[in-house]
Amino acid sequence: MSCPIMEPIPPMAPVLLSACLKEAGFSSIGKDLNIDFFNHFKDSGHWGDIHNLFAIGHVTKISLPRRVIIDILKFIKQYLLEVKKQYDPEYIGLSIFTSESVDFSILVMSYIKKYLPEVKIVLGGRGLENHHGLTDMKHYEMYNKFGMADLIVVGDAETSLIDALTDDATGIY
């Protein structure tokens, strides 16, 4: 599942990795949360502020009306519950394509843990390899330290993800 990068561009990683997993005998589907989120909120009248909040929110103070924040959280919850209903996944993988995806991914991970506690969270993507602005850690190190994901695949994942899932690996792989 792609985490929003706040641009209406379909990311390739979820579809590519889904195909690799299928080839290796896993059941998998690529979901584009990025496009679904964009389509849901683009005409809300608040898209500019929503975009800025998640794209540069950790740098700049952006203020959104409470109702918009509630709508974003409801969207994430409904999206995840629909994924659960349709696919009943054992894992949900999040593609953190750029550092713009990082803030949104934290919301998604917290909602997976809250509403789908039996589903394991797998993270990957180049956005995880950037340094967190407030620490010396890279994002994937921070996520691992605080137990935000069950498995974090660093680097190209076409084969390492398959190996990690086959080995039932946890932590940084």
What are these regions (language model features)?
Residues 10:
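Conserved phosphate-interacting/catalytic interface
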Residues 37-50:
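N-terminal beta-loop-helix "entrance" segment that forms/cooperates
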Residues 48-84:
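Glycine-rich, highly charged phosphate/nucleotide-binding loops
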Residues 25:
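Short glycine-rich hinge loops at helix-strand junctions in the catalytic core
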Residues 13, 17-20, 29-35, 69-173:
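Glycine-rich beta-alpha loop elements in corrinoid/cobalamin-binding modules
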Residues 45-46, 53, 116-117:
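Short alpha-helical interface elements
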Residues 1-6:
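Nucleotide-activated donor-dependent transferases that construct or modify glycoconjugates
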Residues 7, 37-39, 130:
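Flexible, glycine-rich phosphate/dinucleotide-binding loops
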